Amino acid sequence: MAEFWTSYLWPLLVVIGQSLLLLILLLITIAYILLADRKIWAAVQIRRGPNVVGPWGLLQSFADLLKFVFKEPMIPSGANKGVFLLAPLVSCVLALAAWAVIPVNAGWVIADINVGVLYILAVSSLSVYGIIMAGWSSNSKYPFLAALRSAAQMVSYEVSIGFVIIAVLLCVGSLNLTAIVEAQNTKWGLLGWYWLPLFPVFVIFYVSALAETNRPPFDLVEAESELVAGFMVEYASTPYLLFMLGEYVAITTMCAMGAILFLGGWLPPVPYAPFTWVPGIIWFMLKGFFMFFLFAMAKAIVPRYRYDQLMRLGWKVFLPLSLVMVVIVAGVLQFAGLAPQ
């Protein structure tokens, strides 16, 4: 019995506890990221934004949560009820699953697997199924059209993100997220992070992440002027909330990936005191919020692309450009003798 406790039950309880703690912290982070998104958008438009609920509007997201929970969920008469209700759950759970392998500090990760980047790419690819299920089961033309757009859009830009990962892999020699951060730990500080030598790759990743998460200017899936609310037209109450939660969790995942792949993860920008006194998780959060600020500014200042422009950018610009960058990075590493052994 003692062996069963120490070998199986206790490790299982530890993982469950870590997962619940991560979930709670992630949900609180999402609440304030959503508020920051609205505040940034308001500032660009010279408005005040949410400022009534709580001091400076800090409790606005929790008020919105209560509003959604107490609304009545509606199911269209011709909808496939099972698939209709399962779709938001699939979208949300798959978005949350990606955080199992993301290290927020040295050793602070639930599963430190050697293929962490591929795991995140695979899980984010599966999240499109939730949108397709919602579009098909709603028995409405607008959600169905949005689901078709989403499938094409996510497949198109996952290719570019895949080549971005290959470029970073060539520099590091590992798909382990912790190893990628440690490879950027040099005496040069932020000048040794991959955003500088791989700047074109960083730009490709940033724009592809916008498209992958259906953020403006690539929000063709839920284009208000064309498709009302896209695949979420027929949803209300908690199912709608789950879709929103899945969307913002996916955004935080991409922000965390950008911080790890290009901004040194939890490493300080200057590897000397007093910067080294700051806990690594604080640096990780600051870099994640910087990436989200770039996401929010794109929403505030860039007009929406047409669908044909979106596809053209993905297949005719980013795909060949990312492939060329992979070849250039591989060539430079080989001829300069910098390739990882």
Swiss-Prot record:
TM segment ranges: 13-33, 82-102, 115-135, 161-181, 190-210, 248-268, 277-297, 317-337
EC numbers, comma separated: 7.1.1.-
Native organism: Rhodopseudomonas palustris (strain BisB18)
Q: What is this protein called?
A: NADH-quinone oxidoreductase subunit H 1
User: Pfam families, alphabetically?
Assistant: NADHdh
Family classification: Belongs to the complex I subunit 1 family.
Return the broad EC class: translocase
Listed NCBIfam families: PRK06076.1-2, PRK06076.1-6
Q: Which reaction does it catalyse?
A: a quinone + NADH + 5 H(+)(in) = a quinol + NAD(+) + 4 H(+)(out)
Native organism taxonomy: Bacteria, Pseudomonadati, Pseudomonadota, Alphaproteobacteria, Hyphomicrobiales
